[in-house]
Structure formats: C-alpha cells, structure tokens
Amino acid sequence: MTKVLYILGDKDGGIVLCSLLCMYALLIMLGCSIPVAVFGTFAFALSSYSFIIIAAGHVIKAWAMAFMPLVLLGMTMLVKKKNKFLATLVFTVALYWHILFGHYQITYYFAFLCLALYLGYLIYSLKNGEKKELLVNSGCLLVGVLIVVLMNSPKLVSNYELGQHSIRGKSELTAQVDGKADKSSGLDQGYAFAWSY
C-alpha cells in the first residue's frame, strides 16, 4: 500500500501534493464552493508550519498530518449518507496510512478531533431519531478502526514496548514528594521544551 504513496512523490513535494488533494476532497464533500475549497486547501497545505516541520526533518509528522483530511472525508461521507462501503473504505485506508507513519502524538490529538465530531454527530442523530443510521455508521467506523489497529498492531505493540525504556522518564502525572519534581529519571524539562515549537 505504501507504494501508492510514492506516486505522489516520496520527497517533500509529495507531502504537499497529498495535503492539497486530501484537503480539497474534504472541503468539496463539506459543500464548499470551488473558490472556497481552493483557498482552504492552499491555506492548509501551504501554511508556514507545514514547511517548517518538513525543513526541520519532521517528515513523518507532515505525512501523518497530510492524511488527516482524508480520514475526516471518510467520516463525512458516512454522515452525509453516501455509499457506506466506499465511505468506510476511504476512512479505513486513510486511517491506515495516517497511523502507518507512526507519529502517535499527532494521532493522539487528531483522535480528540474525531471524537468531538463523532459526539456532535451522535447528538444530532439522537435528536432527529436516526438511531438505525447512527448504529450502522458507528459500526462502519468501528470496523474501520479495528481493521487499522489489527493491521498496525505489530508496530503499535513494539512502539509501546520500546516506550517503556524511553529516556523521557516517568509520567509527570504522578504524585510528587514535597511538591518537587522527581529528577532521578527522564529528561530535564528545559531540555525537553527546548525542542518544542
């Protein structure tokens, strides 16, 4: 499947092209006019942040972000009552590619966006009495997520296992003795934040 991505180009231009195509498809599906879709597409794909992370070598992060609109496209197709098989296929393939790149921080935050959109759809469906449609669409999304998790499970499990031996140390969400941070493990906070932008 990843060979398909190389049609877009395995270099930096491929990331931008993928971002352009995915965002344009999403905005058209959302009902935007062509000029608005073109403007939104360029605003997303050609933002300064995209070029900063590519230039800084965060190519995996850029690829993961490029596929976010395509995942949302699959969800939108289900909500807009398009072909369920095609919508599930788009959602599953896009989510597979998104997770395949392995930038789990982006996936983590993107999951919050997807959950917020799903909760909005859930409330809307329950208010309008579309329970059967809600169950079918939820099932389609769940099947897609399960397929993607199973296909990526070796990578996800190995990442989890290696994370147990990370130099980043223990979670900051643990109890602190006398209100002071435990400096016996992990990176110094100043060092870690120096790499954030």
Task: Report the location of each language-model feature.
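Short, flexible coil/linker elements and helix-boundary hinge sites characteristic
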Residues: 9-10, 31, 128-129
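Hydrophobic, small-residue-rich membrane helices and short re-entrant helix-turn-helix hairpins
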Residues: 128-136
